[in-house]
Design a protein with these regions (language model features):
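Conserved SAM-binding loop
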Residues: 2-85
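S-adenosyl-L-methionine-dependent methyltransferase catalytic module, highlighting the catalytic core
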Residues: 57-68, 72, 76-181
């Protein structure tokens, strides 16, 4: 099974759509912050979560726990979120939390173990919430006018440039893999 949470009007063929707004006519109208997903354990192989996670408040953790429950081992969660230092994130009053690769790695048991071993001051959220997501891949989506400016530049230059300025990176695209073994 494939699900699209926070689907809005974006219907993806062969995906079950889930949205809070009944006007979007989802397959399931529910609140992912509080409701139990209507699927059996280990039933989902792919999740699309495009521009939804940044809208979640305290229910963010519940949503991740529910995704973990319904996903099979090896399931892929495809996340797209606005970069927290872009006006698209800052201007929308419904954006409640920044979502970053650094924040998502806290939901990895491997990263939690590495943090404890090295004495890093990071939250062991995988252990606390009993989930385990590893980052399979992630990349920046820069604003169109910066795409050419970065061609051939060393990664260190790009990172420094991004960290010193706003509105350079429009989005993060992140893929998580679910670990249950």
């Amino acid at each position: 099974m494939k699900i699209n949470i926070g689907s809005g009007y974006d219907k993806i063929p062969d995906f079950v759509s889930i949205d809070y707004d009944k006007d979007n006519e989802p397959d399931y109208c529910l609140n992912v912050e509080t409701d139990t997903l209507p699927f059996e354990d280990n039933a989902v192989e792919t999740v699309v979560a495009h521009h939804i996670l940044e809208h979640l408040g305290d229910g963010y953790f519940h949503c991740l726990q529910e995704l973990y429950r319904v996903c099979k081992h090896g399931a892929i969660i495809d996340i797209r979120v606005p970069h927290p230092r872009h006006d698209a994130f800052l201007a929308d009053p419904t954006h409640r939390r920044p979502i970053t690769p650094m924040g998502l790695q806290l939901f990895s048991k491997k990263f939690n173990e590495l943090s404890k071993k090295n004495g890093w001051p990071s939250s062991t959220l995988a252990e606390y919430f009993k989930v385990d997501f590893d980052i399979l891949e992630w990349h920046y989506i820069p604003e169109e006018k910066y795409k050419q400016a970065f061609v051939g530049k060393p990664k260190e230059f790009i990172e420094e440039y991004i960290n010193e300025r706003n509105n350079i990176i429009k989005e993060f695209h992140i893929k998580l893999i679910v670990n249950k073994e």
